[in-house]
Amino acid sequence: GWAFTLGKDKPVENYQQPRNIFAACGGASIFRRSLLKETGLLDENHFAYLEDIDLGYRARIAGYRNVYVPGAVVFHAGSGTTGTRHNKFKVDLSSRNNVYLVYKNMPWFQMLLNLPFLLLGYFVKILFFARKGLAGTYVKGLGKGIRLSLSAKGRANRVAFQWKNLPHYGRIQLELWRNLLYCIRA
């Protein structure tokens, strides 16, 4: 998984139409009560970073849509609390939560289908963070994510696969592949 911000630092004119998105930023989203009753609230295991993607992912699995609304205006300072964009705290938690997000939301067949892309993404991020002196922090975070996923606490919140949601998983998979192509072209 690799979360990215749609339209960041791009002309606003290109984003004037409502459109479906995978998940919304937690600092800029509104959820229906019915969705939260069905999917649950924010997962405390995430604490910070990717908790919004987790909730959006669970909504998608349950068949809900996440929609970008261009008329909504939100002022949100990303990483406002932790300071810099890349610091040990954020890199550690983000990498941990990335692994947990995949484990929690993807059924085994989808994890296997995406494993080559996930491993490549983790490798690219190791190289990226090596240039910033944070590769060790990133790798330790990945290890923490694996341990969290395998713990009783992590397994307790894993989304149970239900056959009725198979079409939703199919749509999610197509979107993941489309987003992969978007990232490659960007």
What would you call each of these model-derived segments?
Residues 105-107:
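C-terminal structural cap/anchor segments
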Residues 101-102, 145:
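Short alpha-helical functional segments enriched in proximate histidine and acidic residues
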Residues 67, 91-93, 183-186:
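Membrane-proximal envelope and lipid/glycan-remodeling enzymes
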Residues 1-47, 53, 62:
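Acidic/His-rich active-site region of diverse nucleotide-sugar glycosyltransferases
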Residues 111-186:
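Non-catalytic, C-terminal membrane-associated alpha-helical segments of glycosyltransferases
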Residues 30, 48-50, 56, 65-70, ...:
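Conserved active-site beta-strand element of glycosyltransferases/polysaccharide synthases
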